[in-house]
Amino acid sequence: MALSQGTKKKVCYYYDGDVGNYYYGQGHPMKPHRIRMTHNLLLNYGLYRKMEIYRPHKASAEEMTKYHSDDYIKFLRSIRPDNMSEYSKQMQRFNVGEDCPVFDGLFEFCQLSTGGSVASAVKLNKQQTDISVNWSGGLHHAKKSEASGFCYVNDIVLAILELLKYHQRVVYIDIDIHHGDGVEEAFYTTDRVMSVSFHKYGEYFPGTGDLRDIGAGKGKYYAVNYPLRDGIDDESYEAIFKPVMTKVMEMFQPSAVVLQCGADSLSGDRLGCFNLTIKGHAKCVEFIKTFNLPMLMLGGGGYTIRNVARCWTYETAVALDSEIPNELPYNDYFEYFGPDFKLHISPSNMTNQNTNEYLEKIKQRLFENLRMLPHAPGVQMQAIPEDSVHDDSGEEDEEDPDKRISIRSSDKRIACDEEFSDSEDEGEGGRKNVANFKKVKRVKTEEEKEGEDKKDVKEEEKAKDEKTDSKRVKEETKSV
């Protein structure tokens, strides 16, 4: 698979301004506020000018039950802090209570997280973007009928199911400090998804992710687990990540990538015990990007929230091939980043318990497993099911410019004019002003229109010919 450096990618980004309002409860380490901090930081770095920003739709219960059980989703829809006493048995059954508390707006929070990931997958499927980013997603512990590890709905599994409608093989990569157990479990018996997790192992949540857990049935050898010890640093992580992922890409040959960028693997995380810097963490994003595959980037863990915001802002810049200064711009949460007010963090002096011998031994065992794979398994593709999120981009172009658009339509629009507008003395910054662009389109000369009409007729004829050819090839393939 050809690698290439520095090719500019089209990036889209999903964010809803309400996501930072959800609150797991006093003393709970999971703070959705970190997503708002990330968003505010990347706005003040000016990164919004270089990507398309979308508000995610709220995923429906029907979308969620493409993976989760009906009764579990019905329970999540129904339970509230004021009616918990009526659901005590179900709370126990669905593991909701301590780690996964009931809080105000719980189901809406799940809808936004899932909506961004599923919509990202649809965008990638339609080749409308190269990279899609949803920092509200990445909730990798949720099971089919159970909440786990602060996660309720597994947006990753739902996004991968969407990608599988168009892609024969999808690779899932997890660099959160915790094992990506919910995603591995969902695809444990299939050869169409390979899950690769680099995580702390041994008396650590969730307790899964042993080197010997390799998948089952058709999925045997399609689960890859790299168990790690405390204190891994940038150098050691890069020394294992690059060769393992190179071998995975060579043997599995996926056509799409989902990268879970949990930031609890950073040095100084409140719940973590690794020693990665933001640059070391982001090297994984940089490397996966060189494979030039459609990529979905998701959030995940991360409990020292100032560092989560730093990390995901920097990784957004990496996705955009954009250099940003180490000096943090003034932003709404500036005081959180003291005393240094810098983007990058230093590693601590903790001991790296991952010796070179240990890492090499695990790596060689994984290579042996990967050699057991058939090169790029063949998959018989079925008719493509309907997309979970309907693409309404065509409707916008047909709107009457003199008519006021509906609230629903404006919500689907890229960004929000007030929040992302440039000041008058700023340059274009690579952003398209949709209204002006349409205005210019309307003032095309008649000659240009005629020329385009002729061109359209030719293209239509060409498309018909190609369609006939492809139909004939399909029929021949069927008969074989």
From Swiss-Prot:
The keyword Nucleotide-binding does not apply. InterPro entries: HDAC_PDAC, His_deacetylse, His_deacetylse_1, His_deacetylse_dom, His_deacetylse_dom_sf, Ureohydrolase_dom_sf. The active site is at residue 141. One of its GO terms (cellular component) is NuRD complex. It catalyses: N(6)-acetyl-L-lysyl-[histone] + H2O = L-lysyl-[histone] + acetate; N(6)-acetyl-L-lysyl-[protein] + H2O = L-lysyl-[protein] + acetate; N(6)-(2E)-butenoyl-L-lysyl-[protein] + H2O = (2E)-2-butenoate + L-lysyl-[protein]. The keyword Transcription regulation applies. Residues 387-480 are annotated as: Disordered. Changing residue 141 to A: Abolishes histone deacetylase activity. One of its GO terms (biological process) is heterochromatin formation. It comes from the Eukaryota. It is found in: Nucleus; Cytoplasm. GO terms for molecular function: histone deacetylase activity; histone deacetylase activity, hydrolytic mechanism; histone decrotonylase activity; protein lysine deacetylase activity. Residues 401-416, 443-480 have a biased composition (Basic and acidic residues). It is an enzyme of class 3 (hydrolase). Signal peptide: none annotated. Keywords: Chromatin regulator, Cytoplasm, Hydrolase, Nucleus, Repressor, Transcription, Transcription regulation. Pfam families: Hist_deacetyl. Residues 10-321 are annotated as: Histone deacetylase. Its EC number is 3.5.1.98, 3.5.1.-. Residues 417-427 have a biased composition (Acidic residues). Found in a large complex with RBBP4 and MI-2. Belongs to the histone deacetylase family. HD type 1 subfamily. Histone deacetylase that catalyzes the deacetylation of lysine residues on the N-terminal part of the core histones (H2A, H2B, H3 and H4). Histone deacetylation gives a tag for epigenetic repression and plays an important role in transcriptional regulation, cell cycle progression and developmental events. Histone deacetylases act via the formation of large multiprotein complexes. Also functions as a deacetylase for non-histone proteins. This is Probable histone deacetylase 1-B. It comes from Xenopus laevis.
